[in-house]
């Protein structure tokens, strides 16, 4: 970055500070990960200079022959990786992938169903604060209060009562396997379409370690980062009968030109996910997450649903008298990066000051952490949570965290 260092020291310094932060902290945010050096190089390539409105072979600008080649490569790889009939790799984000899917499948004012945000859903699944809550008539479904898993019986009851045009599944904080076959059966009973958002679990699905929604869903949306380890962006998979509607919804309805440098990086990430080592990596994520869950239980902490089937755990801190906001700040001061999160059915919580925290293992696993490092990290978490606001303990843990982190290079930066 010699040119940037000279031309814009302020931006250069911020990048260097962020690099140091990545090296000296343990990232347990379930939606974050480290990309490979190859993905970073593709995203920083000359494709950032190219406008490519339209689709391969049907561009509105000249000079798109290599943009076409890159996008076709990304499309083919996405289809192969997920065994899909059609793929659109242009969405700038998961939220925009979802928006395009809605615009293609339903009309404003139609009834849709989505998992309520406080039970692990996502803003784009029907939140009143989101465009979905403003454009559509949203019926929320939730979890069973005893099992803290999706209440499929009540979901079916609500579907039969309200007859939605679209049912959305997928989550941002749900630690259990989703029953796509049951969702499909419910949709068929009310003649609804099924949309599945696999943003969090795409890597697990690609590796065959979580059931795939592709055989059951009309449309599947995802991000290309998180467990998939690609660049920040989105993509859509669908059955061939919806291909034209999906493509038109992405362009020209919600986007103009695609970010071709990101499309190039997506192509690289899809190729990386096809390698045998990617399955091994995803298995390690699951192993580390099981170790994390067990160690958290040993500390006496309550896990939502009692455990996890995927890459994340949701911890209810209300029994120990700590809120998620204070926990997030204290752990950050100690070099452990997590996010606060609402807990299903918890009382006296808000989005800003929720009752719990969400922890995940994708980034730590990418860095090379195994069960031993996860156990050590959870022990530090326990020490911080039991001594909220104790600066001496926070400094002690921070020093130990930095010492551990120096043994594990950061993908894309150190290796």
Swiss-Prot record:
Biological processes annotated in GO: glycine biosynthetic process from serine; tetrahydrofolate interconversion
Record-linked InterPro entries: PyrdxlP-dep_Trfase, PyrdxlP-dep_Trfase_major, PyrdxlP-dep_Trfase_small, Ser_HO-MeTrfase, Ser_HO-MeTrfase-like, Ser_HO-MeTrfase_PLP_BS, SHMT-like_dom
Cellular localisation: Cytoplasm
Named cofactor requirement(s): pyridoxal 5'-phosphate
Binding-site residues, (6S)-5,6,7,8-tetrahydrofolate: 117, 121-123
Highest taxon, organism lineage: Bacteria
Entry's Gene Ontology molecular function annotations: glycine hydroxymethyltransferase activity; pyridoxal phosphate binding
EC nos: 2.1.2.1
Cystines in this chain: none
CDD domains on file: SHMT (cd00378)
Keywords on record: Amino-acid biosynthesis, Cytoplasm, One-carbon metabolism, Pyridoxal phosphate, Transferase
Top-level enzyme category: transferase
UniProt record similarity statement: Belongs to the SHMT family.
Assembly behavior: Homodimer.
Protein role: Catalyzes the reversible interconversion of serine and glycine with tetrahydrofolate (THF) serving as the one-carbon carrier. This reaction serves as the major source of one-carbon groups required for the biosynthesis of purines, thymidylate, methionine, and other important biomolecules. Also exhibits THF-independent aldolase activity toward beta-hydroxyamino acids, producing glycine and aldehydes, via a retro-aldol mechanism.
Protein name per Swiss-Prot or TrEMBL: Serine hydroxymethyltransferase
Organism name: Dehalococcoides mccartyi (strain ATCC BAA-2266 / KCTC 15142 / 195)
